[in-house]
């Protein structure tokens, strides 16, 4: 119940983007961890699905006639891509770590603001939770006579039960809507306050003579440029690794095409 209430408050206050702030038992992932996980899942998915397509093609009549041996080349390509991913890992991680260091002060200030607002709205959340539990208890009490009547066979038609349940459900929905609207009204000032604080933080960054947003942008661009320079030799290694695969494919295809032409002319 507490998790549901906190999640609801989070939607009112800051949106789903700040949900990790309330998850005390699961520390948020760093940007690098999220990118790495997504990239790994994507690459593995493409690799497996691509290999399936290649296998299906080689098993077809046309694939057998061409005899391109794509699976052999596929394993070589996979090895090359995996090597590139391993080499790029430290470089990309360094980029994210540098960017996190540059924005550390801003993130700390925003965390303080969130903690303060969380403490201020906690009484409203507790009150909402209490009222919600009371509504669920009342709903359960109203359901008990229906359950008893059903067990005793007093309800001859299922339609009667459905009508009574529908009426109870509408009552609970209407009462819950009142509580939610009340909570939204109570939290609205704090939501506005949090947005204003964020705007103030960003404005201060613009006007400060130190770490301004322009500097953040410049530093991020510098880190990206460094990342690109470090990735160039690795991408060149990938290109060189692909050349034998492409040449093998080209030779196999031309050989198969020549063989097919000879058979067609006979």
From Swiss-Prot:
Chain spans, region 10 X approximate tandem repeats: 68-266
Modified residues (Methionine sulfoxide): 110, 136
Post-translational modification: Glycosylated. Palmitoylated.
Signal peptide, first to last residue: 1-18
Spans traversing the lipid bilayer: none
Entry's Gene Ontology BP terms: adrenal gland development; amyloid-beta formation; blood vessel endothelial cell migration; cellular response to lipoprotein particle stimulus; cholesterol biosynthetic process; cholesterol efflux; cholesterol homeostasis; cholesterol import
Subcellular compartments: Secreted
GO cellular component: chylomicron; endocytic vesicle; extracellular vesicle; low-density lipoprotein particle; spherical high-density lipoprotein particle; very-low-density lipoprotein particle
Sequence repeats: 68-89, 90-111, 112-122, 123-144, 145-166, 167-188, 189-210, 211-232, 233-243, 244-266
Molecular function as annotated in GO: amyloid-beta binding; apolipoprotein A-I receptor binding; chemorepellent activity; cholesterol binding; cholesterol transfer activity; enzyme binding; heat shock protein binding; high-density lipoprotein particle binding
Keyword Secreted among UniProt keywords: yes
Alphabetically ordered keywords of this record: Cholesterol metabolism, HDL, Lipid metabolism, Lipid transport, Lipoprotein, Oxidation, Palmitate, Phosphoprotein, Repeat, Secreted, Signal, Steroid metabolism, Sterol metabolism, Transport
Tree of life domain: Eukaryota
SUPFAM superfamilies: Apolipoprotein A-I
Family indicated by similarity: Belongs to the apolipoprotein A1/A4/E family.
Functional note: Participates in the reverse transport of cholesterol from tissues to the liver for excretion by promoting cholesterol efflux from tissues and by acting as a cofactor for the lecithin cholesterol acyltransferase (LCAT). As part of the SPAP complex, activates spermatozoa motility.
Subunit comment: Homodimer. Interacts with APOA1BP and CLU. Component of a sperm activating protein complex (SPAP), consisting of APOA1, an immunoglobulin heavy chain, an immunoglobulin light chain and albumin. Interacts with NDRG1. Interacts with SCGB3A2. Interacts with NAXE and YJEFN3.
Protein name (Swiss-Prot/TrEMBL): Apolipoprotein A-I
Species of the source: Callithrix jacchus
């Amino acid at each position: 119940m507490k998790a549901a209430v906190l999640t609801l408050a989070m939607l009112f206050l800051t949106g789903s983007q700040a949900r990790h702030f309330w998850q005390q038992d699961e520390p948020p992932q760093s940007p690098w961890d999220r990118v790495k996980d997504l990239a790994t899942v994507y690459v593995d998915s493409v690799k497996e699905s691509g290999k399936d397509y290649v296998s299906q093609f080689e098993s077809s009549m046309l694939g057998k006639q061409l005899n391109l041996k794509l699976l052999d080349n596929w394993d070589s390509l996979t090895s090359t891509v995996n090597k590139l991913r391993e080499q790029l890992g430290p470089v990309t991680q360094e980029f994210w770590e540098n960017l996190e260091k540059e924005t550390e002060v801003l993130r700390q200030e925003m965390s303080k603001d969130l903690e303060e607002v969380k403490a201020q709205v906690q009484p409203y959340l507790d009150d909402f939770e209490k009222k919600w539990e009371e509504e669920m208890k009342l709903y359960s009490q109203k359901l008990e006579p229906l359950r008893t009547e059903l067990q005793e066979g007093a309800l001859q038609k299922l339609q009667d039960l459905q009508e009574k349940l529908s009426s109870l459900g509408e009552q609970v929905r209407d009462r819950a809507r009142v509580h939610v609207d009340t909570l939204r009204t109570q939290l609205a000032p704090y939501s506005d306050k949090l947005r204003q604080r964020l705007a103030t933080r960003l404005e201060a960054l613009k006007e400060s003579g130190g770490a301004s947003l322009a500097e953040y942008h410049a530093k991020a661009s510098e880190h990206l440029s460094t990342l690109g320079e470090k990735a160039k030799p690795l991408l060149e290694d990938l290109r060189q690794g692909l050349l034998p695969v492409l040449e093998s494919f080209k030779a196999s295809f031309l050989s198969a095409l020549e063989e097919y032409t000879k058979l067609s002319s006979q």
